[in-house]
Every structure is written in structure tokens, then in C-alpha cells.
């Protein structure tokens, strides 16, 4: 009798343990079996929709985060040295560049500390690719290069800090009213424009940019922060550039139908899709890709997939940014 009771207890404990295991497994399903969900902790999602970090999960058929859990966060300077930064933006301090002396390595590193996920998400290759993508897109926005420029057109990023041929860019909004005498034209690496964007950005980084928009063109740390704010911030229906380039964004069925897939091309769509995407071959898109490829090569990382947006439907026609290339 005692033996039977003991066997029943062992059997009951075993059943409960199995149920706990099954229940825990169901809580960690991912991929197409779970509506595109990502695994917690950066773990791989296997072809069958389960989370883990071994070859069974991260190997052939892996659906997402296939590099496994991210390494511990590190200072950005461990991924991009001062000398590499100077090589990437080789002619930014050329005498012909109005931004000479403004965009410094130290300002870039200091600004990035306000956004600890930037360059710190995913495996080392993903982190480097994000840095290349950010500098590639912003180099296009501030380029001073031309087809036959010394060292090629993609060595002339960060030549400008202010938009050429600027306008006022003031739209009457009660939440972010234009300050008297101020203009909200494109400034900084991402060429942020319009009063409501200066207002949102200033609120996020703790600076009164509505009343002092020119801080984006006179304080190099604030200037980089403005670009990183845009990069890291989702503005519905657009995801953040950060989430797209690090594959944390899962496209909806509407995105897939619009050919908006994870990759550098969708970042271009976020930034200036209304003018550049869905138009077939476009020299502006090619320019963005040229910078990106050069920077990936210097960082020793692959380009990833979906580099252009030639066949993508734009997210929308409202523009956050003022593109230097189109304003010439």
C-alpha cells in the first residue's frame, strides 16, 4: 500500500513537472508560429517556433535573432575607433566644407551614450552594421561629394551642418508653436526640420530647441543627439530606423505587400521615402547605398539584404527631414 502511494506521488510530481515544462515552452514560442514574436533575451527562434541558443535553434531554418543572445553592452568606441571614424568621414574637415571642425568623434561618442541601445543591439556584426547605416544615411544628408571628388564621392559625408537654400519651416501647431524670429530648416547630421520636430526632439533630449533651434548647428553633441533621436524613435506608421536595421522590426502583411522588408532600403523609406522610394532606380538612393557599403567595408561587416527601396511603397508623404540633395 505504501509502495503504491509512493508510486502515485512520483507519477503526480512527474506530470506536474512536464506540464510546467510544456507551459513554459508555449510561453516562449516565436516566429511565424506566434505572429512574428521575437524570443526573449535575444535568443534564436528555430524553424519550429521555439526559443534557444544552441545550433538546433540558431542553425538552418532559424527564423530570427539567429546570432543568439547579444554580447554584453559595450562602449561604442570599442566598435568604431577614432581612426576609423576619421577614415569614414575623411573629408569632413576639408577647407571647402562649411562644417569643418564641427562633427567630432568625441561628440559622436558622447551623444551615443544618451541612447545606450544604439550600436548595442544584436551580435557584433549587427552592431557594426547599424553604425554604418546611421553614418551612411546621415552622410548622404550632409554630403559635399561629387562624382570625381578626391577619394570618391563617398568620402565626403558630414560636409554641411545647415541646409542650403533654407526656408522657415514653420507650421502652426498649438503644442509646438514657432518662436518669434526662429527658423526650423534642416540642421545637423539628419537635417532635422520643422518646428514640431524640433519641439519633440528638444523635449526628448532635454533642450529647448523650439526657442533655440540653432543649437543643433552650434553644439556638436546636441547635433548628434538630434540625429540619434530621429534614428531611435518610431513615428507611426513608421518603425524606428534602429529597429529595422537590427531586425527587431517584424513587417506586417501590409508592409510585405508594399515590399518593405528589414534592411537598409526600408531605413531610406523611413527617412525620405515620399520622394525617393517606389520610383525605380534613383540616384539619391544609390548615393545612400554607396556611403553605407563603404562604411560596412571599413568596419569589416556584410551589407545585409534589401539595400534599396526602388520598388517599395512609401510609408507616407509627410517628411520629417529636409534633404540636402533635393534642395540644391
Swiss-Prot record:
Q: Report if keyword Thylakoid is assigned.
A: no
Q: Which CDD domains match?
A: chitinase_GH19 (cd00325), ChtBD1_GH19_hevein (cd06921)
Q: Which UniProt keywords apply?
A: Carbohydrate metabolism, Chitin degradation, Chitin-binding, Disulfide bond, Glycosidase, Hydrolase, Plant defense, Polysaccharide degradation, Signal, Vacuole
The record ties this protein, via InterPro entries, to: Chitin-bd_1, Chitin-binding_1_CS, Endochitinase-like_sf, Glyco_hydro_19, Glyco_hydro_19_cat, Lysozyme-like_dom_sf
The UniProt entry's GO CC annotations, sorted and at most eight, read:
vacuole
This enzyme's EC code(s)? 3.2.1.14
Positions of the Chitin-binding type-1 domain = 28-68
Q: Where in the cell is it found?
A: Vacuole
Signal sequence region: 1-27
Query: Broadest EC class?
Result: hydrolase
Q: What is this protein's function per UniProt?
A: Defense against chitin-containing fungal pathogens.
From the Swiss-Prot or TrEMBL record, give the protein name: Endochitinase
